[in-house]
Amino acid sequence: MRIGHGYDAHKLVKGSHVVLGGIKIDSEFSIEAHSDGDIIIHSLIDSLLGAAAYGDLGTFFPSEDDKYKDISSRELLKEVVFKLKEDKYQISNVDVTYVGQLPKLNP
């Protein structure tokens, strides 16, 4: 059994929305990032990559590579899951916690 721990943080800037867990949420802020800036999926990806000893998100998907510009983090997650399956890894459980003041997620 392998265990990974993922983490992601981005700067908030004036904008129109954020993407969290693949869901677009209207907001007066946006997350500054090369991709869609989905910190929930980025953290999950980072954890999966770490558990498999593949490096981190920035190594696997470098921000200098224009093919990842504005890409949906869901697509990045699909690539990682495909690579894990290809290498015979099996994901048995994940747990993600969002810590942030904005956007407010409570009803």
Regions found by a protein language model. Give the residues of each.
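C-terminal binding/interaction regions
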Residues: 2-5, 103-106
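A short glycine/serine-rich beta->alpha loop
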Residues: 25-35, 63-68
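Acidic-glycine-rich active-site phosphate/pyrophosphate-binding loop
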Residues: 9-24
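Extended beta-strand/beta-hairpin segments
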Residues: 3, 10-14, 80-87
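A generic structural signal for residues located within well-ordered alpha-helices
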Residues: 35-40, 72
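Active-site His/Glu-centered metal-binding helix of metallohydrolases
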Residues: 40, 44, 48
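Glycine- and Gly-Pro-enriched alpha-helical subdomains that act as flexible
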Residues: 48-91, 101-103
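Conserved, well-structured core segments that form or line functional sites
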Residues: 94
